[in-house]
Structures are given as structure tokens and as C-alpha cells.
């Protein structure tokens, strides 16, 4: 799988993280998951790298809360279906760099991504994302 970033072009948090970590200095393929939804192969690859589909689900998503999913006993199959159903269920951004996967906006994840890219704090990139 090539180095790729799954993100929402309209998400301020995604844009902030990508700028902070200077991803524009690396040859990534960008996929806006709103206009180009994830396919089964992509979701399965992410789960294979993280060990579960659940680890890729954004449990803070409004849709997750509205459906009361936190109160349900969901299986990994259920989490896979959610990821394929709607982009809002994916923790984002997701950055695949070589054999590493970074998902979400947790400070430790963002710091690990910056380190993997060889960037230190304060070495922001331009924040430019591809025009879609």
C-alpha cells in the first residue's frame, strides 16, 4: 500500500494536524473520504495493521452517539460495517507511512507521526492539501 492520507478536506482538525506534522513535505497520496469513500480493501488493510476494526472507529462521532452505539455490544464485524457505511465513523486523519499507521487526533499519535516524518515541533509545513 502506498503512503496515503485519509482525511476530510473540510475538517479543521485534519488540516491542523497535517500542517503541524508537515505532511506536505512527503510524497503522500491524499484521499478525501467524503468524496471518495473507503472501500473494503482499504478498511481491511487498516484493521490488519491495527489489530481490529474497533480501533479505527471514532466513538466521539455525532452519528455514533445519536445511534446509541456506545450502549450496544458491537462486534468487530459491526465496526467494519460502520466504517464502510459512513466516513464520520473513521478516526481521522489516518496516515499510512510505510508499515506504520497513525489514526486520529490524540496528541501522542500526532507527535509519533511528526517523529516518523522526521519533523520536530515548530517545523510546520505549508498546510497545502490537494485541490479536489
List PLM regions with ranges.
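Local sequence-structure signature of Cys/Sec-based thiol-disulfide redox active-site neighborhoods
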Residues: 1-22, 28-33
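Thiol/selenol-based redox catalytic cores and closely related redox-interacting motifs
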Residues: 35-132
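Generic structural signal for short, solvent-exposed loop/turn connectors between secondary structure elements
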Residues: 25-27, 98-99
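Short, solvent-exposed secondary-structure junction/capping segments
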Residues: 27-28, 61
Amino acid at each position: 500500500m502506498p503512503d496515503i492520507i485519509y482525511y476530510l478536506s473540510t475538517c479543521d482538525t485534519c488540516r491542523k494536524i497535517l500542517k503541524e506534522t508537515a505532511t506536505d513535505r512527503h510524497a503522500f497520496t491524499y484521499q478525501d473520504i467524503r468524496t471518495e469513500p473507503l472501500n473494503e480493501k482499504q478498511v481491511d488493510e487498516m484493521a490488519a495493521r491495527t489489530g481490529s476494526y474497533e480501533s479505527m472507529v471514532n466513538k466521539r462521532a455525532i452519528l455514533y452517539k445519536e445511534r446509541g452505539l456506545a450502549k450496544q455490544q458491537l462486534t468487530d464485524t459491526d465496526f467494519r460495517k460502520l466504517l464502510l457505511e459512513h466516513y464520520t465513523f473513521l478516526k481521522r486523519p489516518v496516515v499510512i507511512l510505510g508499515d506504520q499507521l497513525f489514526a486520529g487526533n490524540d496528541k501522542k499519535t500526532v507527535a509519533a507521526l511528526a517523529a516518523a516524518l522526521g519533523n520536530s515541533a515548530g517545523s510546520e509545513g505549508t498546510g497545502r492539501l490537494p485541490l479536489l
